[in-house]
Amino acid sequence: MPLNRTLSMSSLPGLEDWEDEFDLENTVLFEVAWEVANKVGGIYTVLQTKAKVTGDEWGDNYYLVGPYTEQGVRTQVELLEAPTPALKKTLDSMNSKGCKVYFGRWLIEGGPLVVLLDVGASAWALERWKGELWDTCNIGVPWYDREANDAVLFGFLTTWFLGEFLAQSEEKPHVVAHFHEWLAGIGLCLCRARRLPVATIFTTHATLLGRYLCAGAVDFYNNLENFNVDKEAGERQIYHRYCMERAAAHCAHVFTTVSQITAIEAQHLLKRKPDIVTPNGLNVKKFSAMHEFQNLHAQSKARIQEFVRGHFYGHLDFNLDKTLYFFIAGRYEFSNKGADVFLEALARLNYLLRVNGSEQTVVALFIMPARTNNFNVETLKGQAVRKQLWDTANTVKEKFGRKLYESLLVGSLPDMNKMLDKEDFTMMKRAIFATQRQSFPPVCTHNMLDDSSDPILTTIRRIGLFNSSADRVKVIFHPEFLSSTSPLLPVDYEEFVRGCHLGVFPSYYEPWGYTPAECTVMGIPSISTNLSGFGCFMEEHIADPSAYGIYILDRRFRSLDDSCSQLTSFLYSFCQQSRRQRIIQRNRTERLSDLLDWKYLGRYYMSARHMALSKAFPEHFTYEPSEADAAQGYRYPRPASVPPSPSLSRHSSPHQSEDEEDPRNGPLEEDSERYDEDEEAAKDRRNIRAPEWPRRASCTSSTSGSKRNSVDTATSSSLSTPSEPLSPTSSLGEERN
C-alpha cells in the first residue's frame, strides 16, 4: 500500500518550525478504542479532537477501529465502500464468516475513516474466545460482567481484523496499532500472542484501580507503593478487568499515559513505567480579533442571566450586574471531582462576603448528571413566570409606544396620565402578584430519585446554603447534561462555559482534566489542582499560572481542611476583582490556548508511534533517543504589567469602578499608559520559548532508503512533566480526611 506523503509540522506562534519530515510510505495506522463514534467519556473527546492533526499526518492511511452502535452510525457515520482492495477483501472475508463489519467516514472535523465491529453479532463465539483467552493469557472473565465480555468480543474481532488485513495486503505494510484503555486492551494482547507483525501502543487515560481507590476515600498518593494491587482489585470485584489492563500495558511495544501524575500511578499499580507521556489537546479556534471571544462571553452570560431571573423569581434581590457565575462539571464522582471541597469552600466564601458587606453575589452551578425522574415543578414554574412577565412588559410597551407615536404624529405632547389605562395596570399588578413566593428558590432543578442520600444535596443541607435572601452565595444543582433544547437552561455546554466567569475543578483524582482545558481555550479562568494532569502540565509551562487565570490548588501537601481554605482564598480574591481586571485576565487566559493545541501536543503521539515502529521492525526502523538533559522546555514568565496576579489584584488607579470599560477600546482612566492590550499580547507571545528538541533520532526505512526523523522520548516527558517529578514514596503531607 504505497503512499508518498510527508508531513512538515508548522509551529505555534512564537515557536520555531518543527522541520522533521516523516516518510509514511507503506505504513498504516489503526487507532483502536471503544469510544470511536460512541460517546461515553473523555476518550471520545481525545479521539474526536485529535483526528484532524493525525489525518493531516497520515492521510488515507489512518483508520479508527471501534464498536458498531446503531445510534452512533445513524448520527455520526457515513457508511462507504472500502477504498482499497486489501481492506475490501478483509471486510468481505470477515462478513462471510459470521461477523458484521462496517466501514465509513466519521462526520467530525478531519473526517477520518472508521472500521466498526458489531460486537453483539459475534456473541456466538464468546465462550470459545473466553476459553482461548484463558489458555493464552490466563485471564478469566465472569459471565455476569457484560462490559468485560464486550471487551473480549471487541478484542478478538480487532485482532481478527488486523490479521486478515495483513494477510490480504499484497505489499506487506508496516502496521501501527494504537489501543486506548483496557476495553481495547485484549486486542493488543492477542496481537502479541499470535505474533502478528504489528507495532503496538497502549495508552491508559486513567487506571482502573486508581479510580476505584480514590472513590473510596483512600489516602491514595501517600500509599501508592504500599497497595497490594491484587488484593485491592479482588476486593472490588474488578480483578479480571485489572488483569486485562495490566497485560495490555506489559505487552505493548510502547506504553503511554496522559500525564506525569498518571505515569507515577501506572508505574506502581500496573508495574510498568510509561515510555512517553502524551498530554491531551484540543482543536483551538483562534479569533481574528481579541474582542470576539469577549463578545461571546457577554452573549452567553445573558442567556444564563435569563435562567437565573426565572429560577430566583420572588427572591431576585441581588444585582445581576454584580453577580459572578462559578461552575463545576463532569462525571458525578463526589470526592474524586472535588465537589466536596467546592461546597465547603462556598460555605466559607458566603461567610466572608456577608461579614465584609460585599455587594457581589456568586451563583455556583453544579453540572453533574445523576438519577432523576423529572424536572422540579417549582423550577419550571419560575421559567414560566419569567416568560409571562416578559410578555406582559412587551404588551404594555407596544400599547405605550403606539399611543406615543399617535400623539407625536399630531404635533402634541402626550398626557402621561392617559398613556396607560386601568386594564394595563391590572395586567401589571397580576404579573407582580405572580412573582410572590413563600419558599426559597430550589437548590436542585430536577426531582432526584435518591434525594435523601445524594451527596451534593446532603452536604448542602449540612452547610445551610438554601438560597436565602441573606446568602451571598447561591447554589444550583443541575443533575443533567446541558442541551440547547432544555426548557430550563437552553444552552449547550460550550455556550454555558463561555458565559461563566470561573470554572472550579478541585479534583482529587483527575488523570488529565478536559474541563479546565476547555475553559482555557475559551478564555475562562479556572481552578485546577496539582493532582490533575492539566494542573501539573500548566504548572510546568507557566511561571505564575494564577496571573494567567489558571489557579492551582494544592491537594498534594495540604490536608482537606487546608485545601478548602486555599480554595476559599482563591474564590474570595476572584470576587474582589473589578470588571476591568477580569477582562484582562480572560485575555491572558485565552492566549494560553496555544499550549493545548493538538498541532503542538500531537508531536508526542508522533514520537510514540516512531518508538513503536523501531521496536517492532528494528530491521527497518531505528530510534536513537538523545540524552535526557538535551531537551529543554519553556515557560511563560509572570506578566509584568498591571494588574498583577488575580489572587493579589489591586486597583490600577485611584478611581477604580465597576463601570470601567474594555481596555482594548480606548483610554482607561489615569493608568491607560500602564496597560496596552496589544502590547501585552505581543509580549506574551514573545515569552513562549522554542523547545530545544534534541538532535533528531533517525528512523530509517530499508525500502525507501530515506531517513525518518523522530522526537526523543525524553523530550516528551520533560516538556509535559516536571524534570524532577515527586517520588511516590515521598511524603505528600497530611492524610486525606
From Swiss-Prot:
Extent of Basic and acidic residues compositional bias: 682-695
Q: Which residues bind UDP?
A: K39, R331, T515
Q: State where UDP-alpha-D-glucose binds.
A: H205, R211, R331, E510, W512, G513
- Acidic residues composition bias: residue spans: 658-681
The residues listed in the UniProt record as binding alpha-D-glucose 6-phosphate, with positions renumbered to this chain, are H291, E292, Q294, H297, K301, H501, R582, R586
Q: Name one GO molecular function term.
A: alpha-1,4-glucan glucosyltransferase (UDP-glucose donor) activity
The record's keywords, sorted A to Z, are: Allosteric enzyme, Glycogen biosynthesis, Glycosyltransferase, Phosphoprotein, Transferase
Region Disordered, as annotated, extends over 634-737
Record's Gene Ontology CC terms?
Answer: cytoplasm
User: EC?
Assistant: 2.4.1.11
Q: Which residues carry this modification: Phosphoserine?
A: S8, S11, S412, S641, S645, S649, S652, S653, S657, S672, S698, S710, S727, S731
Give one Pfam hit by family name.
Answer: Glycogen_syn
| Residue positions where Phosphothreonine is found in the record | T700, T721
Record field: catalytic activity:
[(1->4)-alpha-D-glucosyl](n) + UDP-alpha-D-glucose = [(1->4)-alpha-D-glucosyl](n+1) + UDP + H(+)
- Family named by the database record: Belongs to the glycosyltransferase 3 family.
Q: What does this protein do?
A: Glycogen synthase participates in the glycogen biosynthetic process along with glycogenin and glycogen branching enzyme. Extends the primer composed of a few glucose units formed by glycogenin by adding new glucose units to it. In this context, glycogen synthase transfers the glycosyl residue from UDP-Glc to the non-reducing end of alpha-1,4-glucan.
Q: What is this protein called?
A: Glycogen [starch] synthase, muscle
